[in-house]
């Protein structure tokens, strides 16, 4: 089992954790249907960038 050599300071711990925060999903409005969807993802009805890519 790994055991640290020296104690990490609060500052170093905070610097390491600075990249751990989560961000909310970026949403866009589809041009054809006006539907909200995640950016760079196909909408629920199969459109991507105004083009039908999935037939349901």
UniProtKB/Swiss-Prot annotation:
Residues 21-31 have a biased composition (Polar residues). Residues 1-38 are annotated as: Disordered. InterPro entries: Ribosomal_bL32, Ribosomal_bL32_bact, Ribosomal_zn-bd. GO terms for cellular component: large ribosomal subunit. Pfam families: Ribosomal_L32p (PF01783). GO terms for biological process: translation. GO terms for molecular function: structural constituent of ribosome. Signal peptide: none annotated. It comes from the Bacteria. The keyword Cell membrane does not apply. Residues 7-16 have a biased composition (Basic residues). Keywords: Ribonucleoprotein, Ribosomal protein. Belongs to the bacterial ribosomal protein bL32 family. HAMAP family: Ribosomal_bL32. This is Large ribosomal subunit protein bL32. It comes from Shewanella woodyi (strain ATCC 51908 / MS32). The lineage of its organism: Bacteria, Pseudomonadati, Pseudomonadota, Gammaproteobacteria, Alteromonadales.
């Amino acid at each position: 089992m790994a055991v640290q050599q020296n104690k990490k300071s609060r500052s170093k711990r905070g610097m390491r954790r600075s990249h751990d925060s989560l961000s909310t999903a970026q949403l866009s409005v589809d041009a054809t249907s006006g539907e909200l969807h995640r950016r760079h993802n196909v909408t629920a009805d199969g459109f991507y960038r105004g083009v039908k890519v999935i037939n349901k």
